């Protein structure tokens, strides 16, 4: 996702960034280190405390470019005015919203003209893949006919079908500019099975990056990275 996002950003330009659902602040801090001004919001005070700890370990020039707030995506329209941000990230957020349209509408309003919206969502067109690859055939059959699922944390969640999401975003005047597949080959890989050798890990990431850009591979990815432009 980091590599994909970097492809879409103009090099050498400091952006005003909003990270909705910033969690531990991984992406927010990475962007701040690159010279961007980042506001991160998350509804979980506990996980936001982890982000504050990580921020405290950064150099002063990075800390000065980051603001962390407790809240959720539904509040962005009240907190920020139109054209407030050049880039908005909503990574792993939409899947927990029964109806994401109100938040997407708010995000579209606070984007500046030419601004980018980066979404990371569960791929509703390939929801049966994980269950099928792990041999859970009942769950596989059920997944063909729904966009609802239970995630690995045991929480209810929802997936997005690309065509439907694209139509919604176009209606909010933030049409899709590009989209990628994420976790094409590694969705069923246990965390402990990830390569520890740096060379092998690099090969894995290169393979995922390449597959995420190409048909038919990206269509069966577990996640979709959708980049929109206002």
Task: List PLM regions with ranges.
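Short alpha-helix
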Residues: 155-173, 179
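Conserved alpha-helix/loop element of class I SAM-dependent methyltransferases that forms part
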Residues: 1-13
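Conserved Class I S-adenosyl-L-methionine
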Residues: 178-230
């Amino acid at each position: 996702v980091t590599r994909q996002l970097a492809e879409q950003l103009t090099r050498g330009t400091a952006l005003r960034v909003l990270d909705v659902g910033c969690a531990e602040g991984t992406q927010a801090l990475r962007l701040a280190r690159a010279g961007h001004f980042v506001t991160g919001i998350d509804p979980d005070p506990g996980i936001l405390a982890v982000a504050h700890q990580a921020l405290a370990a950064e150099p002063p020039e990075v800390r000065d470019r980051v603001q962390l707030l407790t809240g959720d995506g539904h509040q962005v329209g009240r907190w920020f005015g139109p054209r407030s941000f050049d880039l908005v990230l909503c990574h792993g957020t939409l899947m927990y919203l029964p109806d994401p349209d109100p938040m997407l509408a708010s995000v579209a309003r606070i984007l500046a003209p030419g601004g980018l919206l980066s979404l990371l969502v569960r791929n509703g067109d390939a929801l049966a893949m994980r269950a099928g690859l792990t041999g859970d055939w009942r769950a596989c059959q059920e997944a063909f006919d729904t966009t609802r699922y239970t995630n690995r944390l045991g929480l209810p969640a929802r997936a997005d079908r690309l065509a439907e999401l694209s139509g919604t975003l176009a209606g909010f005047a933030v049409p899709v500019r590009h989209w990628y597949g994420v976790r094409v080959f590694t969705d069923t890989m246990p965390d402990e099975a990830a390569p520890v050798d740096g060379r092998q890990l690099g090969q894995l990431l290169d393979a995922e990056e390449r597959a995420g850009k190409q048909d038919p591979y990206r269509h069966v990815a577990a996640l979709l990275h959708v980049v929109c432009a206002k």
